[in-house]
């Protein structure tokens, strides 16, 4: 509860009311927020740190080839990896969106902790996605067929949410670029549909 009071105090100091009821952020608060980096924060032993450790262990357990399976199959490339299950199962309309979340989460961990193992896995996934985009030959990149977009726009049935999935993939790639400086991830985020 004490942390909530500090947060409220911070907001009270950082935001002030100007004449006419407009909100304005003080320059010093803005500068402080702009200087804020994820590695400047250390989580104390708590349920939050336990959850971060649990999620980090899960992300480390994921093999890049399994994450790339549906992308490769969709691009006509061979894959001998065991497909992921659940939302990423082959044939599921949202396949690919979890990989976007993976990219966002792992890039945040790499930025924060400079974990070499996670950085290598992230690089492998980006390189694998690049190979898939090249195999498509038209700039397209996803774990579902490009025709799903046409089906959605013309028949309105039979597909789930291709634009949502593309957004997750693009956001993940942008996060990789912004957090790690990976130029290839940025180029990949410019998906052509």
Go through the PLM ranges and name each one.
Residues 20-98, 119-146:
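Low-complexity, Ser/Thr/Pro/Gly-enriched N-terminal "stalk/linker" regions
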Residues 191-193:
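Conserved small/polar residues in nucleotide/adenosyl-binding loops
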Residues 10-18:
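Hydrophobic h-region of N-terminal signal peptides that target proteins for export
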Residues 2-9:
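Sec-dependent signal peptide recognition
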Residues 39, 90-104, 117-120, 160-168, ...:
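Aromatic- and histidine-enriched alpha-helix N-cap/loop-to-helix transition segments
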Residues 148-160:
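Aromatic/His-enriched, Gly/Pro-containing loop or helix-boundary segments
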């Amino acid at each position: 509860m004490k942390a909530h009071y500090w947060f409220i105090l911070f907001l009270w100091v950082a935001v002030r009311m100007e004449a006419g009821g407009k909100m304005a952020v003080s320059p010093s608060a803005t500068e402080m927020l702009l200087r804020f980096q994820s590695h400047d924060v250390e989580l104390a032993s708590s349920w939050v740190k336990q959850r971060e450790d649990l999620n980090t262990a899960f992300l480390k357990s994921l093999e890049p080839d399994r994450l790339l399976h549906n992308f490769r199959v969709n691009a006509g490339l061979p894959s001998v990896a065991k497909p992921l299950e659940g939302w990423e199962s082959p044939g599921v309309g949202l396949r690919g969106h979890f990989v976007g979340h993976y990219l966002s989460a792992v890039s945040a961990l790499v930025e924060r902790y400079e974990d070499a193992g996670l950085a290598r896995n992230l690089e492998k996934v980006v390189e694998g996605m690049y190979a898939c985009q090249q195999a498509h030959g038209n700039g397209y990149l996803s774990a579902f067929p490009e025709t799903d977009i046409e089906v959605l726009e013309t028949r309105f049935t039979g597909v789930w949410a291709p634009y949502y999935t593309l957004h997750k993939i693009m956001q993940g790639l942008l996060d990789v670029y912004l957090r790690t400086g990976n130029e290839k991830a940025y180029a990949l985020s410019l998906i052509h549909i």
